[in-house]
């Protein structure tokens, strides 16, 4: 399959992330805060990664002290801060505007990767980035929300930058020989405990009060954190950061489709065009070319 397997892995990750809205809404009904949701995702995913490592390779738990910053970066600076900034941005602007600023992430990934890893900024990559961003804007409903502020913009851009940094810190860890399991175990563990430090642990009695609640919390960690981050970091082992980040833009497309099929939300012309643009960007990136 060549690089196709890495492409499919990243697309799979973006698809699973697209279901986050469904899980977040359900956790909201249980009374969990934004930081509680992050803790649930991170800790259950860390548990799954830990079990997998115990079964397959216990040596994967070993991390050199001089490399600890990679995992602090991916867990605290990226996963935790990206989520907190994104949720905070929603307090100062519409959901659509917050989402649009989050989707600036591929721009930062391409820039940082060019500076740090000497990845080439090709015309095709730039074109795909612009097309994907335009598609994300349309899918998110640009212009439908008027509430906006400087504080909201700063939090929104912060979410985009922190989101982008996961690819960067993960690349540093991959280049140092760490497996996708090691990277994600410590990323999720640190993000989970970091979220508990911010929002407390009052969610624990809630999710353990009934078997359905506990199963749903575990499913949240599995579907929105364990599987997508495993797939995405695996994709990074065979793809450039910039390409992977752009292809992960399939996430808002899936989120929109979830809204349509699960919550009976209407598919607008704007959203339909946005979906086509995102898919076009993904196709453009995967056309064979010596310069792509």
Language model: regions and residue ranges:
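Hydrophobic transmembrane alpha-helices of multi-pass small-molecule transport proteins
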Residues: 49, 112, 121-141, 160, ...
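Membrane-interface helix-cap regions at the ends of transmembrane helices
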Residues: 45-64, 133-147, 190-213, 257-261, ...
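C-terminal transmembrane-helix exit sites in multi-pass transporters
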Residues: 48, 53, 86, 105-130, ...
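Hydrophobic/aromatic residues within transmembrane alpha-helices
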Residues: 27, 37, 41, 89, ...
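Specific transmembrane alpha-helical segments of multi-pass solute transporters/efflux pumps
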Residues: 21, 50-97, 138, 221-239
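Transmembrane alpha-helices of multi-pass small-molecule transport proteins
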Residues: 29-81, 108-109, 162-169, 184-203, ...
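Helix-helix packing/entry segments at the starts of transmembrane helices
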Residues: 40, 83, 98-104, 170-192, ...
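Glycine-/small-residue-enriched transmembrane alpha-helix faces in small-molecule transporters
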Residues: 1-36, 40, 145-172, 193-194
